[in-house]
């Protein structure tokens, strides 16, 4: 696990403009928008996942709708190692695609040269709004992200960091290259994850309570400096979910 952490590509200690230059590629995905993988995964996220969730059925449904053979599943999941707890490498790729695609779409229409930037709250709420079509399946998504292993270390956590980094960089939030740079991003990451957890259980109309929760969580995190409490909260969330998932898997035999 430590070796994997050391091999991970990391962003510099503080943001530089070169890290946020928009490009046609979809890194860290290893395929482009003109590829069969992108066609299937994009269709699955838009059409199949809102109905059946983040699972292989969603992929099979999209393969059938697009007239691709079922053997495409192995191609879609080729970049992911098999996992004991994850359902399949293809589903892991579906989750990765969801995380990366939504992060890129969040800022694709923003003008980097504009002097007027959206607030951090606006961008956070916009990202949560992107979850509305799949909100009823967020518990399933989050359970995958909480599983310890290569996928969590190499995909889920780096994507969460990239999201928090982009939220701050593209917003009007003031940023400084000091110790608070890192703690601010951890706090924002935890505020976002907490909001997703809330949304997964929210039954209010149009997820109104989720957005109110997110506003309050963000304000307490960014204005009152709940960085360290949030870090502890994230650690406990991951640990407890891991234990509960392991117990569930053992009970099933």
Briefly describe each language-model feature range.
Residues 131-151, 158:
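Amphipathic alpha-helical segments used for helix-helix packing
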Residues 88-104:
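Short, basic, alpha-helical segments at the C-terminal edge of helix-turn-helix-like DNA-binding modules
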Residues 151-172, 185-189:
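Amphipathic alpha-helical packing segments from all-alpha helical-bundle domains
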Residues 27-71, 78-88, 92:
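Short, amphipathic alpha-helix enriched in basic
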Residues 4, 204-253:
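C-terminal peripheral helix-coil segments that are non-catalytic and often amphipathic
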Residues 181-200, 214-220:
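Hydrophobic alpha-helical segments that form the core
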Residues 108-137:
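Hydrophobic alpha-helical connector segments
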Residues 1-30, 253:
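N-terminal mitochondrial targeting presequence
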